[in-house]
Amino acid sequence: MNKEQLEKMTHGKGFIAALDQSGGSTPKALKEYGVNEDQYSNEDEMFQLVHDMRTRVVTSPSFSPDKILGAILFEQTMDREVEGKYTGDYLADKGVVPFLKVDKGLAEEKNGVQLMKPIDDLDETLDRANERHIFGTKMRSNILELNEQGIKDVVEQQFEFAKKIIAKGLVPIIEPEVNINAKDKSEIEKVLKAEIKKGLDSLNDDQLVMLKLTIPTEANLYKDLADHPNVVRVVVLSGGYSRDEANKLLKDNDELIASFSRALASDLRASQSQEEFDKALGDAVDSIYDASVNKN
């Protein structure tokens, strides 16, 4: 583990850019960027176009390490190059800490939740991540209803994988998303917090994790998770809120910082001139940074 990057992730001012749309969500991400499905004829072309989009984001002067602490990449992105360097090295050289999405998507809903599908090649992926100088990982589950067994299963699965990731020298971001439209969202979050606390308490002193959570209904609910000795940082997802709404809610939560994907890229278009693109990205970065750093 890179100690300088750990220091930046623990104490740095800023947020994490989530650039990890995978195969399933890529057509939608490209469409929002203004690239329609008739502009590519196969998956290779699609992934090249999305890599071009991400390259445009990370090479922009608006993608500044003064405001962006880290970036989460999709596996394809990790294996591709930006300006002649592997993406992780390009980011690290720029001062942005690289993370890798390692989950294989969500299983069918059961007990009001979606667990992660099995990650059969996890060891191999983590070895490649280490070769590519990746600092940490991210994996997402989804909680849809207040079901204590389901929530417990989600958290147990996350920590089970987290321990394997830590053993390989990486810092896992544990992401048990709570659907923002869940009927009992506030109650779900209280159960989730208690389960996460149990998971954290099961770790040894040197086993560090990060948490990526839905912005809680009750402000500052997760503050004591952020203060837990095994937690490097708690970040939040935008989860379907508009950028303005997500930023507004984030400002009410001390110590939590953003890890936004759609809310970061929502105003970016393929047709923009470089100047327009840099300004749109810069405006998004500035507003998300402000919500992460300057609290109410």
From Swiss-Prot:
The keyword Transport does not apply. Keywords: Glycolysis, Lyase, Schiff base. It is an enzyme of class 4 (lyase). InterPro entries: Aldolase_TIM, FBA_I, FBA_I_Gram+-type. It comes from the Bacteria. GO terms for molecular function: fructose-bisphosphate aldolase activity. The gene is fda. It catalyses: beta-D-fructose 1,6-bisphosphate = D-glyceraldehyde 3-phosphate + dihydroxyacetone phosphate. Pathway: Carbohydrate degradation; glycolysis; D-glyceraldehyde 3-phosphate and glycerone phosphate from D-glucose: step 4/4. It comes from Staphylococcus epidermidis (strain ATCC 12228 / FDA PCI 1200). This is Fructose-bisphosphate aldolase class 1. The keyword Transmembrane helix does not apply. The active site is at E175, K212. Belongs to the class I fructose-bisphosphate aldolase family.
